């Protein structure tokens, strides 16, 4: 059984499909639209994690949590367009910031943004499940509810004592957070 919010989608789908055909739009535009979505959302079908961009309030909250002295490493799992990383890097010169993004277009935007800001960020295109979390002092995740339990298992196995796992918005099932901001 489907969730109730699918009902309006089913009701409007056919009329919209017929209206679109009546507009006689070139199929090239549909290809461009599809490829754009593919570049933006990448492997969402596999990861179950769409593109979420961190807000300014998250930037402000993270600035209070990160160490003010002593070098530290920070990784953003699913770093999107790199806004969070560049903002944090501009405030915390003592940090080395890493971003891992699986969608091609946000990763490219992040790399270009990083080149323009000349910050201490290192952006990688790939799957964060393939990275070793023991290399980082702070692991930040703004993913979705789907991978949180697996993320916790990976973090528990790989992260060093004293390192910090920060989850934005989505709870880890069965785990009480040490602190909520």
Model features per residue range: what roles?
Residues 1-9:
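Membrane-helix interface "capping/anchor" motifs
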Residues 10-49:
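Transmembrane alpha-helices and immediately adjacent membrane-cytoplasm interface residues
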Residues 44-158, 164:
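Membrane-proximal soluble helical/coiled-coil segments
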Residues 162-171:
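Conserved beta-strand signature within the Rossmann-like core of class I S-adenosyl-L-methionine
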Residues 171-181:
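Active-site capping/gating segments
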């Amino acid at each position: 059984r489907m969730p109730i919010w699918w009902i309006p989608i089913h009701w409007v789908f056919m009329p919209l499909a017929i209206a679109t055909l009546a507009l006689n739009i070139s199929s090239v535009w549909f290809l461009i639209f599809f490829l754009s979505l593919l570049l933006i959302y990448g492997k969402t079908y596999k990861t179950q994690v769409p593109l979420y961009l961190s807000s300014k309030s998250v930037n402000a909250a993270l600035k209070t949590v990160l160490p003010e002295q002593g070098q530290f490493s920070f990784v953003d799992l699913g770093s999107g367009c790199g806004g969070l990383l560049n903002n944090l890097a501009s405030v915390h010169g003592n940090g080395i910031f890493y971003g891992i993004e699986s969608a091609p277009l946000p990763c490219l935007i992040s790399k270009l943004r990083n080149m323009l800001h000349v910050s201490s960020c290192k952006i990688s295109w790939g799957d964060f499940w393939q990275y070793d979390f023991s290399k980082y002092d702070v692991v930040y995740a703004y993913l979705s509810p789907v991978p949180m339990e697996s993320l916790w298992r990976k973090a528990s196995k790989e992260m060093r004592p004293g390192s910090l796992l920060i989850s934005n918005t989505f709870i880890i099932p069965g785990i009480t957070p040490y602190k909520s901001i």
